[in-house]
Amino acid sequence: MKVLVDTPVWSLALRKQSKTEADERAVKELTELVRESRVVMIGPIRQEILSGISDEGKFETLRQKLRAFDGEVLTTEHFELAASLSNRCRRQGIQGSHTDFLLCAVSVKGNHPIFTLDKDFDRYRGYVGIELYQERNGAE
């Protein structure tokens, strides 16, 4: 099964500074998913990852590396579902970003779990029917 990987996981993996033990486990899990060719990406996540890289050489290198990952084709239905999911959560007093709900819509339509470190998705889950990816124990 393909897994949608959210920006915070990618950001963690791309950071050079030291990481906590939990961070290291998340990076190790992402590495395994990449090795298994199970990562799927949406354009807005790709954009978030690439935004803010001022060095053109680093930008181009990362852009080329990210091209290895399947890009989910977004349709009108994805955007409409994202709006519907956002509205459903707002009625419950839960707010989130457009990208978060687009990720939820792609997850629901494609039956892809979401690998994220963002705790907001725990709140969305109760109202939008997404599955959150759980790290495997001892991912090698």
Could you tell me what each predicted segment is?
Residues W10, R46-I49, F121-D122:
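A generic structural signal for short hydrophobic patches within well-formed alpha-helices
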Residues T20, D70-F115:
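Active-site neighborhoods of divalent-metal-dependent phosphate/nucleic-acid chemistry enzymes
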Residues M1-M41, S51-R63, G138-E140:
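Short, well-structured N-terminal submotif of metal-dependent ribonuclease cores
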Residues V27, I42, R46, F59-L62, ...:
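A general structural signal for well-ordered alpha-helical segments in protein cores
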Residues C104, V108-E140:
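Acidic, PIN/NYN-like endoribonuclease modules and their adjacent C-terminal/linker elements
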Residues D6-T7, I49, A82, S107:
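Generic structural signal for small/hydrophobic residues in well-ordered secondary structure
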Residues D6-T7, I45, L117:
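A secondary-structure boundary/capping signal
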Residues R35-S37, K65-F69, Q92, G110, ...:
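Structured helix-beta-strand junction loops
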